Amino acid sequence: MPKIVVVGAVAGGATCASQIRRLDKESDIIIFEKDRDMSFANCALPYVIGEVVEDRRYALAYTPEEFYDRKQITVKTYHEVIAINDERQTVSVLNRKTNEQFEESYDKLILSPGASANSLGFESDITFTLRNLEDTDAIDQFIKANQVDKVLVVGAGYVSLEVLENLYERGLHPTLIHRSDKINKLMDADMNQPILDELDKREIPYRLNEEINAINGNEITFKSGKVEHYDMIIEGVGTHPNSKFIESSNIKLDRKGFIPVNDKFETNVPNIYAIGDIATSHYRHVDLPASVPLAWGAHRAASIVAEQIAGNDTIEFKGFLGNNIVKFFDYTFASVGVKPNELKQFDYKMVEVTQGAHANYYPGNSPLHLRVYYDTSNRQILRAAAVGKEGADKRIDVLSMAMMNQLTVDELTEFEVAYAPPYSHPKDLINMIGYKAK
């Protein structure tokens, strides 16, 4: 009976194991998870903190016991894989509760250890990061136990923005700082102004080009010279792949610690796959490498690996498009395609339109800003971005499908919109992009 070992039990690992079991009823499947919880919804965590998700249990799909009862898959939490011997096809495992170590053999090894939150490195009892359900519980319990009011949020990426919004909605008083003036880097810089407008509208303090110099109890000294007091600090300063344990093996890592994979999510070592935040692959629509540590990619990779292990040799990954979205108070920010800083590798043109998300005479209309970049050599779409209170998600998803099928910007005129006054225009913003490009 083949033995399949999975490292990591969240989006990629748990999904892959589940899909393998759906296709293969016989194999022995074991998942090692270094932390307390398995199969939780990472993207739900800020909303648990904000009490938008009313019960944290809604963010937890399975316990190990439930997973075994439903799928006959063994999940061992607090078990950290600390080394791989790919020549003997074994992994070394540390039981973090007992501090005991043991070896586990495998026929197939699936690596989905995810990433960990970066830290600024200050020794402080009021400083937290958010990466898993344990972090979420710690933040929630600290807020309740210490009657937290003033919270400093460090960083201005997706997670920090979501955390700040949810702290505000919970009734706390957050302040945002960021070390540069470049916020929300997945979005075009000049399309981020509504973020600052939303902060100003709610009188939420923020400072760009600001950093922490020192923390002394609740007293924070900043690079600017300001000294302020906060009850709590939440750091959202990026992540790094959990790949240290892989260095002992023959598995190739890139300079940032990610694992390059082929179109089957195979590593350079036979019988070892890598999926989720740790894997780096390529874009679908252009010839560039891509690392897209988001939920869709982890789930797609899980299905592809499961199909292969079950015997489907023809299935392949065709690449990322990098579709991403975030809600910040009343606005939605969405984009798809290459990152803004990757556009310089192409000879491109940009076309954009700003108009109401639906018919102007229908109540509740608000402006939607849609922008498309296309390659001048073949007029295919490289990147699209949208910002507005309504309809950004729909337009970016349509453009994602257009890019998946390598449509040109001119072909957007042929997009047949589902039109009624509450939803769109007879000539949608997507159509208008095509017309303007001509």
Curated annotation (Swiss-Prot):
The prosthetic group or cofactor this protein requires is: FAD
Q: How is the cofactor bound?
A: Binds 1 FAD per subunit.
One Pfam entry for this protein is Pyr_redox_2
Recorded catalytic reaction(s): these are:
NADP(+) + 2 CoA = CoA-disulfide + NADPH + H(+)
Q: Per UniProt, where does NADP(+) bind?
A: 151-166
| Example of a GO MF term | CoA-disulfide reductase (NADPH) activity
Supply the alphabetized keyword list.
FAD, Flavoprotein, NADP, Oxidoreductase, Redox-active center
Q: What class of enzyme is it?
A: oxidoreductase
Q: Which residues form the active site?
A: 43 (nucleophile), 43 (redox-active)
Could you tell me the EC number(s) of this protein? Answer: 1.8.1.14
Which annotated residues bind FAD?
Answer: 8-33, 267-277, 419
Q: Which InterPro entries match?
A: CoA_disulphide_reductase, CoA_disulphide_reductase_staph, FAD-bd_OxRdtase, FAD/NAD-bd_sf, FAD/NAD-binding_dom, FAD/NAD-linked_Rdtase_dimer_sf, Pyr_nucl-diS_OxRdtase_dimer
Annotated substrate binding lies at 15, 19, 22, 39, 42, 71, 299, 427
Subunit structure of this chain's protein: Homodimer.
Return the domain comment text from this UniProt entry. Contains 2 FAD binding domains and a single NADPH binding domain.
NCBIfam families this protein is in?
CoA_CoA_reduc, PRK13512.1
Known function: Catalyzes specifically the NADPH-dependent reduction of coenzyme A disulfide.
Q: Which family does it belong to?
A: Belongs to the class-III pyridine nucleotide-disulfide oxidoreductase family.
Q: What else is known?
A: Reduction of disulfides occurs by a thiol-disulfide exchange reaction, but involves only a single catalytic cysteine residue that forms a stable mixed disulfide with CoA during catalysis.
* Protein name per UniProt: Coenzyme A disulfide reductase
Organism, by scientific name, is Staphylococcus aureus (strain COL)
